[in-house]
């Protein structure tokens, strides 16, 4: 995902690159919430019923700082399944670049810190 985002600093993305960025976002989102769920289960949290529950719990455990942005990410991830127009795709891509990618990086850094303890 970072590679495609870096291209946006040089020029507009072509259709293939936009599609690639959205697909990489979808994969990264799935890995991120499942990583949070695994961490929570390893720490005795039970009864989680999906990504929204997992994100709420991750916020309460301080795995993530911006719970609202993660909830918006869930909504946008669900929207990517039904993107049929360029305007909607452009909106989601803007969020991926400016909001969601930094959130993934923050989660990665937090998990790295926890792994070193």
Where are these regions (language model features)?
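Solvent-exposed interaction patches of small proteins and small membrane subunits
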Residues: 1-117
């Amino acid at each position: 995902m970072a590679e495609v985002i870096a291209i946006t600093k040089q020029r507009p993305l072509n259709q293939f690159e936009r599609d690639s960025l959205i697909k990489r976002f979808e994969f990264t989102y799935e890995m991120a919430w499942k990583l949070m769920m695994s961490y929570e289960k390893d720490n005795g949290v039970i009864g989680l019923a999906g990504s929204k529950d997992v994100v709420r719990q991750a916020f309460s455990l301080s795995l993530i700082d911006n719970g609202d942005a993660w909830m918006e990410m869930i909504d946008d991830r669900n929207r990517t399944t039904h993107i049929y127009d360029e305007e909607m795709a452009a909106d989601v891509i803007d969020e991926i670049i400016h909001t969601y990618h930094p959130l993934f990086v923050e989660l990665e850094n937090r998990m790295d810190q926890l792994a070193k303890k």
